[in-house]
């Protein structure tokens, strides 16, 4: 998957298009991600026991990973990620849009 937990991403499609948030959870089986404060849904919960009251829960629903792109806050640009090796041979992630500017 092209994104990791903790990445800052920009939403490309849907009702939250253009918003920026951080990935809090990754669901690998379905290639979905949960982004903080994005795609917030409400669920109405009926009371289960006598004397209990109903609730309205808010939660962040997952969105497909193809609908997000990694966001660079320093240059304020969303870009795909390329992998390169540094001097010590360690793999690092580099923004493709920033490769052409250097």
Swiss-Prot record:
The keyword S-adenosyl-L-methionine does not apply. Pfam families: KOW, ribosomal_L24. One of its GO terms (cellular component) is chloroplast. Gene3D superfamilies: 2.30.30.30. InterPro entries: KOW, Rib_uL2_dom2, Ribosomal_uL24, Ribosomal_uL24_CS, Ribosomal_uL24_KOW, Translation_prot_SH3-like_sf. One of its GO terms (molecular function) is rRNA binding. Keywords: Chloroplast, Plastid, Ribonucleoprotein, Ribosomal protein, RNA-binding, rRNA-binding. Disulfide bonds: none annotated. Its main location: plastid. One of its GO terms (biological process) is translation. It comes from the Eukaryota. Belongs to the universal ribosomal protein uL24 family. NCBIfam families: rplX_bact. Part of the 50S ribosomal subunit. One of two assembly initiator proteins, it binds directly to the 5'-end of the 23S rRNA, where it nucleates assembly of the 50S subunit. This is Large ribosomal subunit protein uL24c. The gene is rpl24.
